[in-house]
Amino acid sequence: MTNRDIVWHEASITKEEYQQKNKHKSSILWLTGLSGSGKSTIANAAARELFEQGYQVIVLDGDNIRHGLNKDLGFSDDDRKENIRRIGEVAKLFVQQGTIVITAFISPFREDRDQVRELVAEGEFNEIYVKCDLDICEKRDPKGLYKKARNGEIPFFTGIDSPYEEPKAPELVLDSGKCEREECTGRLVDFVKNSLA
């Protein structure tokens, strides 16, 4: 069997029907930024708040995805690209089911984030840059990863010996180095209410 033999199966419930029932649009909120910038913390806090207000929402977190779906991938540039490609495809499926998908991935390469944007309709991908200076992320270092990277124990670590390409025109910037978690979370929730309601 080849890819030509595989046919896309149309669902019996359309994205528009899901959105009508959910009373909100579906979208990917792609949180990107350095390790320790607060992506997962903000994503989960916003998801909780949105869920309590009746939104259909799911968080796809980089560490959690690497425990299952992407556990076969390392951290080379090619593996990072494949990691983002796979999660982009998963996020697209949730968007088709009327869900707001909040992702929390370093996703260091602009090209990879742009490829995910191309998977969904215009306006269904929102790049959220969780901005935080490297020195602040290193001071936070909640998982001890920066220390290990500085000691040479973790190769290809973003921000240390592998580059991070900042978004050029994100839909929203959350400066977690200057704002408290609650303020960043509130701004993300407000963004959803203003653009997806």
From Swiss-Prot:
<dbReference type="GO" id="GO:0000103">
    <property type="term" value="P:sulfate assimilation"/>
</dbReference>
<dbReference type="GO" id="GO:0070814">
    <property type="term" value="P:hydrogen sulfide biosynthetic process"/>
</dbReference>
<comment type="pathway">
    <text>Sulfur metabolism; hydrogen sulfide biosynthesis; sulfite from sulfate: step 2/3.</text>
</comment>
<keyword id="KW-0597">Phosphoprotein</keyword>
<protein>
    <recommendedName>
        <fullName>Adenylyl-sulfate kinase</fullName>
        <ecNumber>2.7.1.25</ecNumber>
    </recommendedName>
</protein>
<comment type="function">
    <text>Catalyzes the synthesis of activated sulfate.</text>
</comment>
<dbReference type="GO" id="GO:0005524">
    <property type="term" value="F:ATP binding"/>
</dbReference>
<keyword id="KW-0067">ATP-binding</keyword>
<dbReference type="InterPro" id="IPR002891">
    <property type="entry name" value="APS_kinase"/>
</dbReference>
<dbReference type="Pfam" id="PF01583">
    <property type="entry name" value="APS_kinase"/>
</dbReference>
<dbReference type="InterPro" id="IPR027417">
    <property type="entry name" value="P-loop_NTPase"/>
</dbReference>
<keyword id="KW-0418">Kinase</keyword>
<feature type="binding site">
    <location>
        <begin position="33"/>
        <end position="40"/>
    </location>
    <ligand>
        <name>ATP</name>
    </ligand>
</feature>
<comment type="similarity">
    <text>Belongs to the APS kinase family.</text>
</comment>
<feature type="active site" description="Phosphoserine intermediate">
    <location>
        <position position="107"/>
    </location>
</feature>
<keyword id="KW-0808">Transferase</keyword>
<keyword id="KW-0547">Nucleotide-binding</keyword>
<dbReference type="GO" id="GO:0004020">
    <property type="term" value="F:adenylylsulfate kinase activity"/>
</dbReference>
